[in-house]
């Protein structure tokens, strides 16, 4: 059983070299049926892999703070194991400073061979003001050289302006971000709730249109949703 401790204490212990022990013997075994959601359990192995990854990451950073890329990798590794019934249940986007060279090259070259967890996140540079043309072109060149199409570009100043047009404003210094697909302007800790209209073999054109109509009504009342058909 995993014993929960204060996050600050847990992080402090990792920095001073104290390695925790964990017992996953009561985690549902791989292949066990999931009655509520359906599908099969992943078993304790993914969680074991996550814990070992975190321990290794903190060991490598002993005596210093984690870098932005190390933090990114830990979050991506967590997302990698969030699987229910064989279905991935996570999506990420990392918005990094324009000057962050580590994140700029996170998906450069054959990154997937040693850091497959990075596939779980989209990466974008966050522009808070109009950059110098030289800096802007350097960023575009690094995007091209990476051969992955990343980092992308997220214009935070524009997001703040667009949000203000709808009566939303920056509160307590927390500026606006976006969802993993960069479709929706969100506040800190807000979320995008993906909903789907499932097409079944028994559906007719009329029943499918009814599904889409109901989804649209829901989304009018809750604008931070995204529809997939």
Regions found by a protein language model. Give the residues of each.
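Single conserved hydrophobic/aromatic residue that forms the stacking wall/gate
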Residues: 1-6, 11, 219-223, 227-229
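Active-site cavity-forming subdomains of large catalytic enzyme subunits
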Residues: 8, 12-199, 204
């Amino acid at each position: 059983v995993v014993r929960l401790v204060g996050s600050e204490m847990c992080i402090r212990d990792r920095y001073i070299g104290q390695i925790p022990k964990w017992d996953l013997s009561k985690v549902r075994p791989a292949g066990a049926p999931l009655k509520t959601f359906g599908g099969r359990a992943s078993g304790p192995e993914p969680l074991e892999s996550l814990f070992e990854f975190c321990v290794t990451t903190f060991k490598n950073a002993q005596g210093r703070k984690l870098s932005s890329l190390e933090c990114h990798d830990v979050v991506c590794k967590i997302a990698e194991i969030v699987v229910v019934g064989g279905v991935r249940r996570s999506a990420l986007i990392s918005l990094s400073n324009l000057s962050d060279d580590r994140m700029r090259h996170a998906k450069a070259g054959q990154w997937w061979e040693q850091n497959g967890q990075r596939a779980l996140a989209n990466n974008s540079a966050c522009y808070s003001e109009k950059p110098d043309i030289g800096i802007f072109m350097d960023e575009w060149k690094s995007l091209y050289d990476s051969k992955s199409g990343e980092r992308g570009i997220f214009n935070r100043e524009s997001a703040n302006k667009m949000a203000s047009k709808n009566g939303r404003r920056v509160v307590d210094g927390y500026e606006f971000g976006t969802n993993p697909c960069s479709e929706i302007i969100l506040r800190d800790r807000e979320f995008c709730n993906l909903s789907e209209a499932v097409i079944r073999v028994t559906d007719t054109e009329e029943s499918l249109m009814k599904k889409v109509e109901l989804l649209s009504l829901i989304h009018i009342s809750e604008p931070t949703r995204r529809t997939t058909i």
